[in-house]
């Protein structure tokens, strides 16, 4: 599936699961601190932003540290409990008025057969063809993630769904 990503985020960005292809880091460079819980994924990512080994369910940043938090095909690698904790941590480190940006996929079943999504990612700076795959018992869908964000007090700014892929943007209240 072809996916176009516009360079439209200003301010500081925490990219959760930012290892591997490092898509968000490649687009936004010095605006980004990319974290991943696997050192080999960080080693594989291009050296275009700051990279840190860290667990998304226990972020080592103070409250209200970032203007934006991104999850680019990262939630699919977490079970439901980890997803909820990671989203809660993302809201904690998000500044009032900041936004969470999620790109991911609906997964009906990824067990026992693996689930794989094949993407062609196009930006104004580069294009890359990659696949993301997982074997896990938890399913996921955009509606569940939307409910999680709502339960955390975020307002939905964008929810685009196309052929099983989704892009959701949630905004933290200015006074939250």
Go through each PLM region and give its residues.
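Conserved alpha-helix/loop element of class I SAM-dependent methyltransferases that forms part
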Residues: 1-11
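Class I SAM-dependent methyltransferase SAM/SAH-binding core
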Residues: 14-58
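C-terminal alpha-helical "lid/dimerization" subdomain adjacent to the S-adenosyl-L-methionine
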Residues: 23, 103-159
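A short acidic, Gly/Pro-enriched loop at the edge of an enzyme's catalytic core
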Residues: 57-69
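A short SAM/SAH-binding and catalytic strip from SAM-dependent methyltransferases
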Residues: 68-82
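A short glycine-rich, Lys/Arg-flanked "PGG" loop and its adjoining helix->strand segment in the class I
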Residues: 84-96
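Core SAM-dependent methyltransferase catalytic element
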Residues: 152-176
């Amino acid at each position: 599936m072809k996916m176009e990503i516009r360079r439209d985020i200003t301010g500081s960005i925490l990219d959760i699961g930012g290892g591997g292809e490092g898509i968000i880091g490649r687009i936004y460079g010095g605006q980004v601190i990319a974290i991943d819980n696997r050192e080999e994924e960080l080693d594989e990512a291009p050296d275009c932003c700051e990279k840190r080994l860290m667990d998304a369910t226990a972020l080592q940043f103070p409250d209200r540290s970032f203007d934006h938090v991104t999850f680019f095909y990262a939630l699919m690698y977490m079970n439901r409990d980890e997803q909820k904790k990671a989203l809660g941590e993302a809201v904690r480190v998000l500044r009032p008025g900041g936004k969470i940006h999620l790109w991911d996929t609906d997964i009906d079943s990824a067990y026992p057969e693996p689930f794989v999504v094949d993407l062609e990612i196009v930006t104004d700076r580069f294009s890359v063809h990659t696949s993301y795959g997982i074997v896990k018992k938890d399913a996921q869908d955009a509606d569940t993630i939307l409910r999680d964000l709502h339960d955390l007090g975020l307002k939905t700014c964008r929810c685009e769904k196309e052929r099983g892929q989704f892009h959701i943007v949630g905004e933290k209240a200015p006074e939250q």
